[in-house]
Amino acid sequence: LKKFKIINTVYGDATGGRWQAVLDIANTLKSYGHEIVLLRGEENAHLNSGEWPIHVIPNTGFYSIAAALKVRKFIQEKQPDLIIAHSGKAVWLFKNAMLGMQKKIPVLAVNHSHNVKRTLRADAFLHITPYVQELVQALQSNEEKKKPQRVISNLTYLPKVEASPKPLKQPVNIVMLTRMVPNKGVHVLIDALALLKQRGIPFSAVLAGQGEMLEQCKAQASQLGLDDLVSFPGWIGGDDKINLIQQADIIALPSITEIQGIGILDAFAWGKTLITTDDIGIRQTAKHQVNAWCAKADDAISLADGIEYLISHPDEALKYAQQGKNEALEKYCFEQIAKEHNDFIFTIVN
């Protein structure tokens, strides 16, 4: 099979799941022997690309001619077969850079957001959920809908250690791993945990992550009398993260809004019972009473009721974890998504 040279790029702040997805698609396509060249702007200098070397071309705005000329030179130097653009900014920059060029390289937009209008100039589309595809197609003409497009989820890496679903322990240990920012719903979870305490339901909880709301969340937990029950270790990685997840009975992802939520896929991969919300982005992957419990988003009472339900129905809690684990193996693991990525790029380049 032919091997392609691919520029994989993101512009605009890529903190969170988007940056992970940039590296993931680099890894999936590299696993099929393609040559991947990573490119970013200076706004993502704080993000680590691991062992991947990365090129940097600053972009000062959507219509920066200087940036477009530098990118044009970069395209001429690298001679790629395909450009994968992970943001509207990246799509515009590369389409502008190729204006008037004899040989046009196809641009594949990867849509990680519900704000899709800037990506419509792309030649092909990878939507991370069916809902993202609906949003794009609602803005496309009938002609544009014929461009290659496919729904391919984000991926999860299956643990290298034993991670099969197990019955909940008593008292349950609830774990959340997230950025401490408003849309992640950490403050809602803390209110829900206070309700569980009021109801006399025993538990312990670890809310791990950094972010602008960390101090506020700690203060909230203290005010609600949760100091003995809830800990805030900050950012956790490596073996500490593995140990934390292994000790979890319930993984909580209480996001108020989410595009997909890689945390959902990770909970599935680890075989953990998941409590999350009914936000439209989350419902693309988490199905209520099938592979997760989906409480009302931004509703502490609904979240507390859900956790209480799982604790009092351990057989169901285990069943959801088993279904999530099956989906991780069949749909969301690296090998499955890598195959889909590879198949799709052949439909674009040929």
Indicate where each model-derived feature is located.
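Conserved acidic donor-binding segment of nucleotide-sugar-dependent glycosyltransferases
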Residues: 288-289, 293-300, 309-314
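Donor nucleotide-sugar binding/catalytic pocket of nucleotide-sugar-dependent glycosyltransferases
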Residues: 123-161
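N-terminal strand-loop element at the rim of the active site
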Residues: 8-66, 149
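Short His-centered aromatic/hydrophobic patch
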Residues: 85-91, 111
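Aromatic "clamp/platform" in nucleotide-sugar-dependent glycosyltransferases that forms part
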Residues: 256
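A conserved mid-protein helix/loop that constitutes part of the nucleotide-sugar donor-binding site
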Residues: 16-24, 172-200, 205, 212-218, ...
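Acidic anion/phosphate-binding donor-loop and adjacent secondary structure
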Residues: 66, 153-171
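Short hydrophobic beta-strand element within catalytic cores of glycosyltransferases
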Residues: 273-276
